[in-house]
From Swiss-Prot:
GO biological process: protein maturation
Family statement drawn from the similarity comment of this UniProt entry: Belongs to the FdhE family.
Main location class: cytoplasm
Species: Shewanella oneidensis (strain ATCC 700550 / JCM 31522 / CIP 106686 / LMG 19005 / NCIMB 14063 / MR-1)
Keyword annotations of the record: Cytoplasm
Function of the protein: Necessary for formate dehydrogenase activity.
Location within or outside the cell: Cytoplasm
Protein name from the UniProt record: Protein FdhE homolog
CDD domains: FdhE
């Protein structure tokens, strides 16, 4: 029978000399792996149809990441905090172009009900899309019609993830302080990723928009930063591949993906596949402090 187990936590002593504050990823590889993982997880999921829709969206993201025109990297200062958080109208033009390509590719692959949604989104004005995109990036999910959010975020993700590695190469990582939002684009993390390189047990937060990863000390709440009152929870066994860290101070939680135990894991897909953990923590009075780009369409409109 399934159960939730509380796991004792031992704070680690990590030296910044042994790690990179920021890790860039190859978006093409990330999207390809995510699509494969969604295909695998769908086989045993009650959300198989939704997993398949997400897989198709992510597969298109992979193609766009490899083939699309992204223009030139927009101007930003090397000492600028969160450099990709306030790009101008030129960025809006490019990601909206990516959105049109994504919708055009997806349209022949879906049923008529969803096709009507896609066609309606394709007809929106650039000004409306700009407003919705800004609302999503600022965390105001209810300001955007839920049926459109998944696709808008997917297009923005392709654009921001293309430029993030180039920005990471150019900034002075020694100036990157520990923070709960992405140091590159300012978005929320999807979850924590526990890695075994450069040494076992290091934690990185994975960005929900630009796919960058940034180091965050273990046993500190990833939302409020407190190092007291954090608890690690597991489902079924204390060595599970996916666990949850909760905070008694802010009553938030974030999932932790132990990728060294399962190299095929993808932070977005496996977060989607473990919604039962969210239900367990919600029942205990905790709320998620993270964002999954494949769950944005499920945000409640107000």
């Amino acid at each position: 029978m399934s159960h939730t187990a509380e796991i004792p936590m031992v704070p680690g002593s990590e030296s910044p000399l042994e790690l990179k504050p920021l890790k860039a990823v190859d978006p093409k590889a990330v999207y390809h792996r995510r699509a494969q993982r969604l295909l695998s997880l769908a086989k045993d999921s009650p959300l198989a149809d939704y997993f398949e829709l997400c897989r198709r969206v992510v597969a298109i993201q992979a193609r766009l990441a490899a083939e699309a025109d992204f223009g030139q990297l927009l101007a930003w200062g090397k000492d600028e905090a969160i450099p990709l958080s306030h790009l101008g109208s030129e960025a809006d033009s490019y990601w909206q172009g990516l959105l049109q390509q994504l919708l055009s590719d997806l349209l022949p692959q879906v049923g008529e009900d969803l096709a009507r949604v896609l066609r309606l989104l394709m007809q929106q004005s650039p000004e409306q899309l700009t407003s919705w995109g800004a609302s999503l990036r600022q965390g105001h999910m209810s300001a955007v019609p839920a049926r459109f959010s998944l696709f808008i975020w997917a297009a923005m993700g392709v654009y921001w993830s293309h430029w993030a590695p180039m920005v990471i190469k150019r900034i002075d990582q020694r100036k990157v302080a520990q923070q709960n939002l992405c140091p590159i684009c300012g978005s929320h993390p999807v979850a924590s990723v526990i890695v075994d390189q450069p040494r076992a047990g290091l934690r990185y937060l994975h960005c929900s928009l630009c796919e960058s990863e940034w180091h965050y000390i273990r046993a500190h709440c990833t939302s409020c930063g407190q190092d007291k009152g954090t608890t690690l929870w597991s489902f079924d066994d204390t060595q599970a591949q996916v666990r949850i860290e909760s905070c008694d101070e802010c009553h938030g939680y974030t999932k932790m993906m132990f990728v060294e135990k399962s190299p095929l894991m993808d932070v977005v897909a496996d977060d989607l596949a473990t919604l039962m953990l969210d239900s367990e923590l919600n029942a205990k009075g905790f709320g998620a402090t993270t964002v999954n780009p494949l769950l944005l369409a499920h945000e409640t409109e107000q």
